[in-house]
Amino acid sequence: MDDSKVVGGKVKKPGKRGRKPAKIDLKAKLERSRQSARECRARKKLRYQYLEELVSSRERAICALREELEMYKQWCMAMDQGKIPSEIKALLTGEEQSKSQQNSSRHMKAGKTDANSNSW
């Protein structure tokens, strides 16, 4: 008897399931591999560029913080000697001016609300 089966009007012969190993186009496979390698190198290059930019920006931030720290150290040494650096004076007077402006604007607002409450 024949081992073939009839399914849906078609005769199927017994054998392995799935794809049959066809002739693989070696040139196409090689080209796909080369393309994949090119893309991988491009991704790697971009990743390294990003990391280098990140490192340089962090190094710039570190330098700026070191300069700021040195400035604060100098201010502290000057204050230990009884001198008040002009920068600190400017900061303090700037804060006092902004506080006085805030207080005056609060008084103005409070005066307006008092005037409104007395009007009835």
From Swiss-Prot:
Compartment annotation: Nucleus
Biased composition (Basic residues): 10-21
PTM field: Phosphorylated by AMPK.
Example of a GO cellular component annotation carried by this entry: nuclear body
Gene Ontology MF terms: DNA binding; DNA-binding transcription factor activity
Region (Basic motif): 29-60
Residues covered by region (Disordered): 1-24, 93-120
Gene3D superfamilies: 1.20.5.170
Keyword Plastid included in the entry's annotation: no
GO biological process, any: regulation of DNA-templated transcription
Keyword Cell inner membrane carried by entry: no
Record-linked SUPFAM superfamilies: Leucine zipper domain
Domain bZIP intervals: 23-86
Annotated keywords: Activator, Differentiation, DNA-binding, Host-virus interaction, Nucleus, Phosphoprotein, Transcription, Transcription regulation
InterPro entries recorded: bZIP, bZIP_sf, CREBL2/REPTOR-BP
Top-level lineage group: Eukaryota
Family from the record: Belongs to the bZIP family. ATF subfamily.
Purpose: Probable regulator of CREB1 transcriptional activity which is involved in adipose cells differentiation. May also play a regulatory role in the cell cycle.
Name recorded for this polypeptide: cAMP-responsive element-binding protein-like 2
Organism name: Bos taurus (Bovine)
